[in-house]
Amino acid sequence: MKVLIPVSPINSLKTRLSEFLSSEERKNLLLNMLRDINKALEGLDVVIISRDEEILEFGKNELKAETIKEKYKGLNKAIKQAFEEIEDDEVIIIPADIPLIKKRHIEDILKLSKDYDVIIAPSRGGGTNLLYLKSKNLIEIKYEGFSFLKHLEEAKKKNLRYYIYDSFLISVDINTPEDLGEIFIHGDSTYTKNYLKGLGIEVESKHSSAGRFVVKRGGDNEVSNPM
């Protein structure tokens, strides 16, 4: 089994965070998220595919992962390329921005894989934040948009044994300043939270019935979020 992590080029990373974090800070945020994900994947064979040489070097040297230089633009094309290049048939696909994933989640997936052909963990926005395939060509890869529903439909259409792994922690992907608040609430002992704290980012409760919190940085930037 291989665990595949596709990673976008650094210069295109997390643009929705650009008003809150500099380009260098967004890069370091990504690297720390990868550290957290890699920690959850301890003992498994990890493959990182990217067009970015710095990401590939980081994956190879620090994470001790296998790396693939992406040839084509687009997430689905990158995954298909990786499928062609890796020999293993059984795969797990994980995005690079879910730092709250834990080793226990992976242990759950491995146990479930004995009984299911496809396991899908949805994101909060209808995407796919973990996809297990007993055989990498079982379904057509359809990331982007509401990919959770697309992958679920593919599994149903082919009469495959599928399981929806519904985990809040896996569902949290980091794309906006509001998302950073979830790291402070749920991400104790993560590289990602420690990095964000080092930048002076804080999260404060608004103590309202709606359960709102505020993400702020040094008193300058402030973002409210209804939970």
From Swiss-Prot:
Function: Guanylyltransferase that catalyzes the activation of (2S)-2-phospholactate (2-PL) as (2S)-lactyl-2-diphospho-5'-guanosine, via the condensation of 2-PL with GTP. It is involved in the biosynthesis of coenzyme F420, a hydride carrier cofactor.
Subunit and interaction comment: Homodimer.
GO biological process: F420-0 metabolic process
Gene Ontology MF terms in the entry: GTP binding; phospholactate guanylyltransferase activity
EC number: 2.7.7.68
NCBIfam families cross-referenced by the UniProt entry: F420_cofC
Native source organism of the sequence: Methanocaldococcus sp. (strain FS406-22)
UniProt protein name: 2-phospho-L-lactate guanylyltransferase
